[in-house]
Amino acid sequence: MMKRANSNRERKDAMFRITFIAACWVVIFSAVAQAQDEKIPVLEVRVEGIRIAKKGEVGVAVFNSRLGYPTHLEHAYETEWTGVEEGKEAVETVFDSLPAGEYAVSVLHDENGNRSLERSKLGFPKEGVGFSNDQKVKLSAPKFDKCKFHLSLGENKKIIVRLNYRED
């Protein structure tokens, strides 16, 4: 009878140890995951200067390389579209899953909803466009290197992009 009591006690002790170790691992993994989440940078893009009389969507594209910048959205690291509300001259978009690195932002006010930049016969934008670092369209769209900025671990960066419309 004594042997059986010891056996039960040993099982209880073993179960306690296993449960304790499992709980410790859960706490450790939770702390590591939380620490990693806190390091993820956040980029807030405020787009200003939307023409109130225009409808459509505002597309904010974040590029992490020169490839496709600024108009080939299929090469953007991440793109968010926001509907234009009547009477609003600004929209805000938050990107909270970007790794640290160099980025450049391009913005399109897609007035006709085709998610593509309409151009004149001379190649100039017919819809509102804007770029990070307040770069403007001159004879051509600004280059990635002129528009780029750095996003660091744990940083909460807010940038303002002002839309420019070509006067017809």
Locate the predicted segments by residue:
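Short, flexible loop/turn segments at beta-strand junctions in immunoglobulin-like
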Residues: G49, F95-S97
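A short, amphipathic beta-strand motif
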Residues: P41-I50, V60
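Acidic, glycine-anchored loop motifs typical of Ca2+
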Residues: E111-E118
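A short tyrosine-centered beta-strand micro-motif
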Residues: G101-V107
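Beta-strand signatures of extracellular beta-sandwich domains
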Residues: G59-F63, S106
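Sec/Tat signal peptide C-region and signal peptidase I cleavage site
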Residues: A31-A35
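Extracellular beta-sheet/turn segments enriched in Thr/Pro/Gly and aliphatic residues
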Residues: E44, G128-E167
